[in-house]
């Protein structure tokens, strides 16, 4: 008979009330000392594990918890430290310097964790790295929980194939050699766990879902080298986010268990299971509860799915678990959450997903009748949610059906539009601008809280927003920026703001998830059809424009980013949701243009993150993503300039799609890529308007004029001068005013110097 256990891959770090964020930021500001900070982090770690124990999870992970990022943890443990930080002597200072930068050294690059909204710190390889195990965090965490709670846990570490695949600074042909150099470190780390009596370790290898058959075979050799040195420690090879194509090779790995995602695999893992079976002597860790979305599971449907898996895989032991780490969903339903009852009851966060696993285990062990009450409650909650969502339906479907090809394209080509826009806008060569947001001071946050608590009237709050907007319009004019922004002081988050103002969205107060470092976001919940209600940005943008003779950009978040940064409904396709959002935003774009705004920016920073992991699935997504953007923007006059912005992406993968957006100007986060995108542009020119970020806004460091001038000069070597823009990487909301003004002053001066040089060349 098959033994059934519940397992988890990872749990949110941030705490129910973002205590983790607050502890980090207090330490960075110097308002708490290191001992206090480490104690706070330890308490949060213990609390996260205790929650999983209390939910009766049989196999609880450790070392998924981190002070910043689990990939950075792995790098630092292996002494994988960039040269510019090796002079630092304190381990904690070094760790945070890599993530955040210091005065004389820029931070390491940050990019998306596969196709999620989580960002990891990219390890930087160079041949001078002296690999050694400097810390066994897995052992420390295992001991800490054993001491505190007396329970066995499952240490987690990023595997050698995935870790090196996610790194940069080496040629592709060098990857295998670097992976092999890491093998002795993995062996040392795992043997120390084995000597401690650890029973299971989880080695995460999500990169195997995108690996070629050759690479899966190569990774198998790594595991053969590692596990041949072990005797009693069981290794779980964990994959997630999709299926593994080289399945037959995967199930032959010399490990004691294999984790597969049966939620986001498009049914492929189950088909592989049916075709090739599964080793009966290995544990099958089946991801059957969605680790990335927030909707309550249909327990009967999920139970039947697990029984289907069991009927095929005659394994001695089955672990049921989330499809991925629960890092990507909120911690738990907050007792003070304000959502409508039928909506709230239809949601399931990390803690609730663990309860679903426990119920499924009971159904598997004792039979479906044993959880009949839970099954019926889940069905009732799902049906109530469906009825609630139906009540919010709109006329969108009819409008979408009436769209024609002309609704998805501008009337004339870019080159013709450019001439008209140059004449209409009257901008200088190498125009300077910012991406949208300016620092949200304590005063801004306090004003928003007073308004939300009804301590301030709408009029009081609007007067404050207007005053802050005017102050920053004046600052921008003093800095001599060419195209201004209103600063977005009325917005807490670029997606949240629109989620609150469009029909079909619900907005939470406490459903926070980690985006990067201490930054947490509350993704809107798309539960029904999305519909435009009334203008959302026109009033604030028009007010800002009234204060200056320079152009002020209208600022919107694009349909694909709103989709990808929300928790979308799961009863219709993502394409249909994106088109609904695009149609709603199209009306906002038209309202801005009708109000006299001549430059409108529609940000799509998350376009790439929505890519399916397998390249064979890309075309379908990229086609409808570009169509959704053009649906948003194509109704404007030829003289109206459409901008878009992207960040944290491997742009090389989507350059054709960027072109298909048909935006007049795209601004791109660039400084943390350390010139990588410029190298690409040398051989793949981009001929529309382009602004490559000249400084990193994620760091408090103020770059010099010379540094930014050099970046501009390097860019102009491969980019057309007459359509190049100068801008920071991203929005400046999280920065302080002093450093923002100083950096922008240097940026404008760098642009002036580059402009003068180009004028002399002409």
Swiss-Prot record:
General function of this protein: Catalyzes the transfer of a methyl group from 5-methyltetrahydrofolate to homocysteine resulting in methionine formation.
Entry's EC annotation: 2.1.1.14
Pathway assignment: Amino-acid biosynthesis; L-methionine biosynthesis via de novo pathway; L-methionine from L-homocysteine (MetE route): step 1/1
Gene this protein is translated from: metE
Protein name (database record): 5-methyltetrahydropteroyltriglutamate--homocysteine methyltransferase
Disulfide bridge partners, by residue number: none
Post-translational events: In response to oxidative stress, Cys-719 can react with bacillithiol (BSH) to form mixed disulfides. S-bacillithiolation leads to loss of catalytic activity and methionine auxotrophy.
S-bacillithiol cysteine disulfide carried by residues: 719
Highest taxon listed in the record's lineage: Bacteria
Biological processes annotated in GO: methionine biosynthetic process; methylation
UniProt cross-references to InterPro entries, sorted A to Z: Cbl-indep_Met_Synth_N, Cobalamin-indep_Met_synthase, Met_Synth_C/arc, UROD/MetE-like_sf
Broad EC category: transferase
Organism: Bacillus subtilis (strain 168)
Induction section of the entry: By superoxide.
Catalytic activity reported: 5-methyltetrahydropteroyltri-L-glutamate + L-homocysteine = tetrahydropteroyltri-L-glutamate + L-methionine
UniProt binding sites for L-homocysteine: 435-437, 488, 603
Classification via NCBIfam families: met_syn_B12ind (TIGR01371), PRK05222.1 (NF003556)
Positions annotated to bind 5-methyltetrahydropteroyltri-L-glutamate: 18-21, 112, 519-520, 565, 609
Keywords: Amino-acid biosynthesis, Metal-binding, Methionine biosynthesis, Methyltransferase, Repeat, Transferase, Zinc
GO molecular function per UniProt: 5-methyltetrahydropteroyltriglutamate-homocysteine S-methyltransferase activity; zinc ion binding
Annotated L-methionine binding sites: 435-437, 488, 603
